[in-house]
Amino acid sequence: MSILPGIDSTPTTNELFEGTNEIHKLEIEKGYEWKVEVNAESKLVIEVKSGIAEIFGTELANDIEYSFYNNKFSILAVEDVSLEWRCPEIPEQKLMIGENKTAKYVYNLHFSLEKMRAASFDGPKVMIVGGSNTGKTALARTLCSYAIKYKSYQPMFINLNPEEGIFSVAGCLTATPISDILDVQSTIWGHSMTSGATMLHSKQPLVKTFGLEHIKENQDLYLATLKQLSEVVKLRLQNDVLVHRSGCIIDTPPISVMDDDLTELTTTFKEFNVNVVILLSDEQEDPLLTKLNDKLSTISSSFNLLRLPILSGVIERDDVFKRSLQRLAIREYFYGSPSVVLSPYTIGVDFEDITVWRPINFIENPEETSQLLPTQLLPVEVKPTTLQHALVAISYADRKANESNVQLAPTLGFGLITEVNDKRRKLRILLPVPGRLPDKAMILTAYRYLE
């Protein structure tokens, strides 16, 4: 019998979606972990019913729903855990659950750092080194979480990877005192100071704008930006006894993006007075360990160099996923997250009311920039081809300041240029708070965002 017009017994896509969004129960044995991958179009909801589970060192509260979007992480069972979850796109038969064989090394490292904090008012300065997908950032996040878990420490987390947006958008180097628990649902660890109400205590990062995506595009500028950040960190440590005693956790870029001499690491080691270096590698006699020891020993003899195995909970992240995180960081900066909704503000300004500079990219324009100083900023002509949909950093430097003052100035915030109208000589700029555009100089970053 044929189906009558307008009547179809086949369920729609929405019906199938709703039908599979059922609650699943899961038991995770102590010492095991669930590796979770959630794509951008999915939503995973988890509720721990009993036991102790943690994500990157932060414990999940029982009987509270946690929602995750576009994320990759592992849930570690500190005790036997019983939880409920729902997500139509994750097949129940294909859950990735396995034993965590590296948690004991992380615990031992944490307790060693605790002893250093207890023994001296000059806290440990830890530099974490490794390749891509070794768990560097996960280890840094876990150590920060453990440091504040039982004592009132406030470690300074320092992100030196411009491709990662942590408490900020990508393209920046940041230093953030961690004084409260980190948001396990957020890919950027939580919110910086915002105009909206947040579930958790917001953080106040110290931000320096590099402006480019890759270190190799202008290594000299990267090193100069790193040194400027280190000066700000030193000043904060001098004026804050608690942060000074808590120390610093430094997440470095992957080894693959550095030069053969490891200049980025040796500069970090020197500028931040590092005394603990952690190499994440599964090779017991990794030649990089010897190379690091030789390079760093020429700078200081008083440091500890340790090798830890690559973390068990690591989930590989490809370039497509990293791009999606960069876009998400920009979106969350202006619009917030599903749990913390923000209302950005669009203003109109004349071409003459803004001054924009840009960093030199030696990879894109080698012939144009061969005679210029690497740390020099170049003026940007206001036109659609250069500024449409561009993310700009608003500096503390006055709009009419010279380029050297702009380059040295800290970052006030970010704006998104949504429209450039040549005929009317007007721009529309999205800002995170209402009010007039600050009369400050801007730095054009390498990132674009199209709504």
From Swiss-Prot:
One of its GO terms (molecular function) is ATP binding. One of its GO terms (biological process) is tRNA splicing, via endonucleolytic cleavage and ligation. GO terms for cellular component: mRNA cleavage factor complex. It is found in: Nucleus. Its main location: nucleus. Keywords: ATP-binding, mRNA processing, Nucleotide-binding, Nucleus. It holds the Pfam family Clp1. ATP binds at residues 33, 72, 133-138. Component of a pre-mRNA cleavage factor complex. Interacts directly with PCF11. Belongs to the Clp1 family. Clp1 subfamily. Required for endonucleolytic cleavage during polyadenylation-dependent pre-mRNA 3'-end formation. This is mRNA cleavage and polyadenylation factor CLP1. It comes from Vanderwaltozyma polyspora (strain ATCC 22028 / DSM 70294 / BCRC 21397 / CBS 2163 / NBRC 10782 / NRRL Y-8283 / UCD 57-17). The gene is CLP1.
